[in-house]
Amino acid sequence: MIKKKVLLLYAHPSQHRSEVNQPLFKAASKIKGVTAVDLYGEYPTFNIDIVKEQQQLLEHDVVIFQFPLFWYSTPAILKEWQDLVLEYGFAYGDGADALKYKLFLCALSVGDKEVLIRQMAIFTLR
């Protein structure tokens, strides 16, 4: 059992083609203590509820972004979420300590073979 409250924010625009992220998200969703949020499912029109999302951040100890890496970046919904929710005065700036002592992790996947990734020198895989 997980003692810390975990917020898993999942962003995959093509879930029907996901071979890695979707199964991981479904498995994590079943773990007690994990709040799993499918951002594309929750906000199909990108109309993100900033107050709700900030409240969720306050209520959790660990925040995980789960997404496939596209062109060295996050999917659009996650970028929009970051831009809106992690605003000045809440996530950073004078007196902003809402995220202080929170653990942040990224669980990301890439869609190419390890050999190709090594050749492109994007990552060093061991």
Predicted regions and their residues:
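Glycine-/small-residue-rich active-site loops that bind phosphorylated ligands and cofactors
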Residues: 15-16, 45, 70-73
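A short beta-strand-loop structural module common to alpha/beta enzyme folds
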Residues: 33-46
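N-terminal beta1-alpha1 ligand-phosphate binding loop
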Residues: 1-34
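A short, flexible beta-alpha/helix-coil linker loop
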Residues: 13, 42, 111-115
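Generic recognition of short, well-ordered alpha-helical segments
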Residues: 19-23, 48, 76-80
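Structural signal for conserved beta-strand scaffold positions within catalytic alpha/beta enzyme cores
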Residues: 8, 36-38, 106
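Helix-loop-strand module that forms the ligand-binding subsite of alpha/beta enzymes
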Residues: 52-126
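Short glycine-centered, acidic/aromatic-flanked micro-motifs in structured strand/loop junctions
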Residues: 10-13, 39-41, 67
